[in-house]
Regions:
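Membrane-embedded transmembrane alpha-helical bundles that form the catalytic cores
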Residues: 1-451, 457-475
């Protein structure tokens, strides 16, 4: 059941009706049943992996909640996390490993062609975050297995996030949620806006992108147009999906974390990752970046670098290394291919180098008499960041790192948009002349609507609240 499917809409409708009528006293139990039904509808065999991750982290959490010596606690959390990520690693990265072994050693090991369960990365990270919070005593372990199972499997977010935190999500499943029209209206607003972004904006941009990059050597002068369209497609599809997910949760009175906050208004790559896939970024910060930065070996490295490079640079270098390692992991998380590793390193290196050059940037701005708070400089930062982000999308679009680099070269050396206007890019599409104009119009209008709403939100205006204050017949 895709988020835009008719079946999904019927599933939600029946779920909401039952939630506020028949199951008013046991709502969380209905949500658990709905979550497992939804997941099983994709492939019932995948429920095994969902249950395995749930059982491992639930059991370890209950054990960690007891009084015991530090070494034993560390062994338990390490073992549970190893098993947790072993499932993810084997299913997601085995064929990638086999392929590289075959390439390096000229081997002929057969691919296992394992099917990756939907949402595995999301619920693995979510359950691992819960376990680490219990280990660090930031939260108490959930003793009720079925309530914990609902936290891991909550169906709106299981496929594409946001990655939930136990202390903010689990308690919302407790008690009785009364029917509130405000939740229904806000939920429907988010769902409709998300569907608009996915179906009007992303789907039309995707067809355009596919025509260019499936024949990128033929249309090598259209890389710029293609990557701009891809930035629209990716944002529309991903943020639109999150809007639908959050909207569905609102219908049940459950508020999920925000996952996108006007990312294309970011003024740096660091700022971009504070706005794009926010819950992945905060997960990496809390459970990877801080543990690495505060580790013993990083402390030793910091002392050595301070002696060699001075106090300021010496303190910054370990942080830069930690950022690069974090984004290497972000790349690996995105997929089992070298292009995703390159994508992660690209972001990590830019953030790391930016950290090292912070003092130099400040000096340059003073010498050039640039006012950091001026509108002109703010706009320059947004454009610069947007360019850097779009370069990173080349690694996501391409099949290989080499292909991404060739596209990058074409981006700056070749510029030929004539196939857009003479129709040759759509030569294989019946009635392409009408199709071309309808598609361009949909992308243009969709982008304008999303840009306007994003601009209002960037200014601090609550568009949803304003819309809800308008009489229904005027909307």
């Amino acid at each position: 059941m895709g988020l835009t499917s008719f079946e999904f809409g019927i599933f939600i409708l029946f779920g909401v009706v039952l939630y506020y009528t028949v199951f008013r006293g046991q709502q969380w139990k209905l949500l658990l049943v709905l979550s497992y039904l939804y997941y099983a509808a994709a492939d019932v065999k995948n429920v095994i992996f969902l249950l395995a991750v749930t059982i491992i982290t639930y059991t370890a959490g209950c054990i960690l909640d007891r009084d015991m010596e530090k070494k034993k606690r560390k062994r338990i959390v390490a073992a549970a996390l190893f098993l947790d990520f072993l499932i993810l690693g084997v299913l997601k990265y085995t064929d990638f490993l086999i392929d590289n072994i075959n390439r390096i050693f000229h081997g002929n090991i057969s691919m296992l062609e394992l099917v990756l369960p939907l949402g595995l990365s999301f619920f693995t990270f979510q359950s691992a975050g819960y376990l680490l919070d219990v280990y660090w005593k930031k939260t108490k372990a959930e003793k009720n297995f079925f309530r914990y199972a609902l936290f891991v499997a909550w169906f709106p977010q299981i496929m594409q996030g946001p990655i939930g935190r136990f202390e903010r999500l689990a308690h919302q499943f407790e008690g009785t949620h009364r029917f509130q029209m405000e939740n229904i209206e806000r939920g429907l607003q988010l769902i409709l806006y998300g569907l608009f972004k996915k179906m009007i904006l992303a789907d039309n941009a995707a067809m355009f992108v596919d025509h260019i990059f499936h024949q990128y050597e033929t249309f090598d002068g259209l890389v710029l147009a293609g990557v701009l369209a891809y930035s629209i497609q990716l944002y529309g599809d991903f943020s639109g999906g999150i809007d639908v997910v959050r909207g569905v949760s609102y219908l049940f009175g459950i508020v999920l974390d925000e996952n996108f906050r006007q990312p294309y208004f970011a003024v740096s790559i660091t700022d971009f990752w504070h706005r794009w896939h926010i819950t992945l970024g905060t997960w990496m910060k809390d459970y990877v970046f801080y543990p690495i930065s505060l580790s013993g070996w990083m402390g030793k490295l910091s002392k050595k670098t301070k002696k060699i490079f001075g106090r300021k640079k010496g303190r910054t270098i370990p942080i830069c290394i930690a950022n690069i390692l974090v984004f290497l992991l972000v790349g690996v998380w995105h997929g089992a291919a070298w292009k995703y590793i390159a994508y992660g390193l690209y972001n990590g290196i830019i953030i790391g180098v930016s950290g090292l050059l912070t003092e130099s940037y400040r000096n340059w701005k003073e010498k050039l008499h640039i006012a950091p708070e001026s509108r002109g400089f703010h706009l320059f930062q947004i454009i610069r960041t947007f360019i850097l982000v779009n370069i990173s999308w080349l690694f996501d679009m391409a099949d290989t790192v080499g292909q991404a680099l060739r596209m990058l070269v074409n981006l700056v050396t070749k510029f030929d948009w004539s196939p857009l206007f003479d129709g040759s890019i759509y030569a294989d599409v019946p009635g392409y002349i009408t199709y071309r104009y309808v598609q361009f119009l949909a992308i243009f209008i969709g982008s304008a609507v999303v840009f306007f709403i994003s601009l209002q939100k960037e200014k601090g205006k609550d568009v949803a609240a304003w819309l809800m204050s308008v009489p229904f017949w005027k909307r």
